[in-house]
């Protein structure tokens, strides 16, 4: 069980109990690795990435001292997915028109005419 990687996978957020070495995930229960938008569905500004990372750090700190379980990781992943949705709704994040598939997984894009 020592080499098992715990993970949380949502549509746009992946969290692993691992570190990255040579593009491989290596099990490491002392470290969490965050993968944001692995399918490149959105266009990201550095400030928006930093907001997600900051929220991730807050959520991890809230769970300090608790057992690290699949459930805990899923809660953190779900919260981050909600943060991503809020950023999209606020116009701080937009869909990538060059994405492999335009499925608008978090709702249709907002335009000033419809807002």
Curated annotation (Swiss-Prot):
Membrane topology listed for this record: Peripheral membrane protein
Keyword NAD: yes
One MF term in the entry's GO annotations: oxidoreductase activity, acting on NAD(P)H, quinone or similar compound as acceptor
GO CC annotations, alphabetized: organellar chromatophore thylakoid membrane; plastid
Catalytic activity: a plastoquinone + NADH + (n+1) H(+)(in) = a plastoquinol + NAD(+) + n H(+)(out); a plastoquinone + NADPH + (n+1) H(+)(in) = a plastoquinol + NADP(+) + n H(+)(out)
Entry keyword Membrane: yes
InterPro entries: NdhM (IPR018922)
Protein name: NAD(P)H-quinone oxidoreductase subunit M, organellar chromatophore
Organism: Paulinella chromatophora
């Amino acid at each position: 069980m020592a080499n098992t990687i715990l993970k949380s996978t949502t549509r746009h957020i992946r969290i692993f109990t691992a570190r990255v070495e040579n593009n491989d995930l290596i099990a490491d229960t002392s470290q969490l690795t965050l993968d944001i938008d692995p399918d490149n569905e959105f266009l990201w500004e550095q400030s928006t990435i930093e907001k997600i990372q900051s929220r991730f750090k807050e959520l991890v700190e809230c769970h300090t001292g608790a057992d690290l379980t699949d459930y805990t990781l899923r809660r953190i992943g779900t919260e981050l997915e909600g943060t991503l949705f809020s950023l999209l709704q606020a116009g701080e994040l937009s869909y990538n028109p060059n994405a492999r598939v335009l499925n608008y997984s978090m709702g249709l894009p907002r335009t000033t005419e419809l807002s």
